[in-house]
Amino acid sequence: MNKVVLYCRPGFEKECAAEITDKAARLEVFGFARVKEDSGYVIFEGYQQDDGEKLVRDLPFSSLIFARQMFVVGELLRDLPPEDRITPIVGMLQGVVEKGGELRVEVADTNESKELMKFCRKFTVPLRAALREAGVLTNYETPKRPVVHVFFIAPGCCYTGYSYSNNNSPFYMGIPRLKFPSDAPSRSTLKLEEAFHVFIPADEWDERLANGMYAVDLGACPGGWTYQLVKRNMWVSSVDNGPMAQSLMDTGQVTWLREDGFRYRPNRNNISWMVCDMVEKPAKVAALMAQWLVNGWCRETIFNLKLPMKKRYEEVSQNLAYIQAQLDEHGINAQIQARQLYHDREEVTVHVRRLWAAVGGRRDER
């Protein structure tokens, strides 16, 4: 199997294609991407027969910025007979994947696919039963086995394949289902909540998003991101010339500092989190984030980089490379991840975690 399907935000197919082509080449997997504008997915086709399998096995899904999901597929199944769509799909998957732990019948995230989504939901139950009977799926769901994907691009037309549960998105269609909290000051709060789900393993939340931590929110007004920190019982310094929502101030956990986020300097050295969602050129934001990390002003940060109209992948790559270079220069080991989240628009969200410092005299930041 030499093809890989990648879901993405509609309108960002070119960025997703540029990224997979670049990162596949680094693994010495060469091929080309098939792109249909505003389709919400990209198909990368390698020149060698096992290229798709190699990518989903060896390319860390966490390293991809513009992809919501990644799985290997075979040839497109066309014109499935309405009276029996199941048999061809089962036949396509037999011998390809054995004892998958989960089935996802999916569509791309577009308005055109909403009607098809209703069919997918109804179709999942009988297809799952048939795949279990054929030995393609285990008799019970398990996260320890591959995920079987059936991806419909049109009625009666689908790709079939699989992903590895330790190298994919755990979410259906690659989208976490989050509910907007009615007491949040703005919908931007969902960006930070989604970032926590994507970047921080669930079993580490109690340690890394703990009660009583100190946090800073740069460009905080009206408080969508501060809300998420307060919700986790952190003490938050919210930095912005604009006012904060009174509901947040009433908690007693928020200190509002009327300052420019680019000029603010923290006066304490035990800040666990700094978050930032400012509308500014990405290079300027990247430089500020690097400054915070190099100076040890925070242990972890989540921030947004607003994207230009053109060469978005190149711009983000340059910004991330700049931050990495600054950390390397100062002997700081850190983990960097970036993703265009479901709740992001013309932007990507970046997470950086300082692990330890290799410079004498600088304390361990873990």
Curated annotation (Swiss-Prot):
Q: Which InterPro entries did the record assign?
A: RlmM_FDX, RlmM_THUMP-like, RNA_MeTrfase_FtsJ_dom, rRNA_MeTrfase_M, SAM-dependent_MTases_sf
Catalysed reactions, semicolon-separated: cytidine(2498) in 23S rRNA + S-adenosyl-L-methionine = 2'-O-methylcytidine(2498) in 23S rRNA + S-adenosyl-L-homocysteine + H(+)
Q: Where does S-adenosyl-L-methionine bind?
A: 188, 221-224, 240, 260, 277
One term of GO molecular function = S-adenosylmethionine-dependent methyltransferase activity
- Give the subcellular location: Cytoplasm
Query: Single Gene Ontology BP term?
Result: methylation
Q: What class of enzyme is it?
A: transferase
- Entry EC number(s): 2.1.1.186
**Which superkingdom heads the taxonomic lineage of this protein's source?**
Bacteria
Instruction: Print the keywords alphabetically.
Output: Cytoplasm, Methyltransferase, rRNA processing, S-adenosyl-L-methionine, Transferase
Which residues does the Swiss-Prot or TrEMBL record annotate as the active site? 306 (proton acceptor)
Q: How does it assemble?
A: Monomer.
**What function does the entry list?**
Catalyzes the 2'-O-methylation at nucleotide C2498 in 23S rRNA.
Tell me the protein family, please: Belongs to the class I-like SAM-binding methyltransferase superfamily. RNA methyltransferase RlmE family. RlmM subfamily.
What name appears for this protein in its UniProt entry?
Ribosomal RNA large subunit methyltransferase M
Native organism is: Klebsiella pneumoniae (strain 342)
